[in-house]
């Protein structure tokens, strides 16, 4: 069904829990993590640090919790080619607080496109191409130039710290997108005749986004 951006809410993670050690991760759909007395609950949002490059710094929703295990909802690690058995251990940390970014304007994104490598053999007059992963994803948002909002304060802090955070985009349909990222705010006001003064912030993805349907 067609959708429009109106009503979309943006937030950033401003507080994380302590690192939780993960001692095993299954090759399954979805992946099941073992972490003794982890204390997580169904629906919690976590950032993963893992020996698997395709999982490292990704963000997932927790599901089917037991005392010592939990699932990474929607994350398929069945392939031992992409996820070598026994090497996905690491840590997770829960997002414990979000700050909404208010007065957002003109959201834009770039990256995420497939990368291709073009090559040719000497004996052939035809070029070939193969896929080689994806370009880095980033978002840019503009905001009303209002330094009294909680979102401005959060972005200022994250810009100064340059630590990893998570951008959450809650669409009007109820679908949610999580992008692990670093944030950099340009708080020099942009003045334009006939427009309100505005600032901007860029969210540089550190791995692929995760999306959950409504």
Task: List where the protein language model places each region.
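Extended, low-complexity, turn-rich repeat/linker tracts enriched in Gly/Pro/Ser/Thr and Asp/Glu
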Residues: 54-55, 147-150
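Oligomerization/assembly interface segments of phage tail-like spikes and tubes
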Residues: 128-147, 195-210
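Well-ordered beta-strand positions in beta-sheet-rich domains
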Residues: 45, 57-61, 69, 176-182, ...
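Short, acidic/charged, Gly/Pro-enriched secondary-structure junctions
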Residues: 99, 151-180
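Short beta-strand and beta-hairpin "edge-sheet" elements
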Residues: 168-213
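Short coil-to-beta transition motif at edge beta-strands of beta-rich domains
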Residues: 35-52, 160-166
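Exposed beta-sheet edge/beta-hairpin loop segments within beta-rich domains
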Residues: 126-134, 155-159, 170-172, 189-196
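Small/polar beta-strand repeat architecture
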Residues: 2-7, 14-29, 35-38, 52-125
């Amino acid at each position: 069904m067609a959708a429009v951006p109106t009503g979309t809410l943006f937030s950033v993670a401003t507080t994380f829990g302590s690192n939780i050690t993960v001692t095993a991760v299954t090759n399954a759909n979805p992946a099941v993590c073992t972490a003794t007395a982890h204390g997580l609950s169904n629906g919690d949002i976590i950032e993963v640090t893992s020996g698997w490059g395709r999982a490292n710094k990704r963000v997932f929703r927790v599901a089917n919790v037991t005392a010592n295990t939990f699932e990474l909802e929607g994350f398929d690690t069945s392939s031992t080619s992409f996820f070598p058995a026994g090497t996905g251990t690491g840590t997770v940390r829960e997002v414990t607080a979000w700050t909404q970014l208010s007065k957002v304007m003109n959201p834009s994104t770039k990256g995420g496109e497939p990368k291709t490598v073009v090559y040719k053999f000497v004996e052939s007059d035809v070029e070939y191409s193969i896929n080689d992963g994806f370009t880095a994803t980033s978002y840019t948002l503009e905001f009303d130039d209002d330094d009294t909002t909680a979102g401005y304060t959060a972005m200022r802090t994250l810009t100064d710290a340059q630590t990893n955070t998570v951008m959450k985009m809650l669409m009007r349909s109820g679908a949610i997108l999580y992008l692990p990222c670093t944030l950099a705010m340009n708080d020099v006001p942009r003045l334009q005749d006939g427009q309100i003064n505005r600032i901007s912030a860029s969210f540089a993805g550190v791995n692929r986004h995760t999306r959950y349907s409504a």
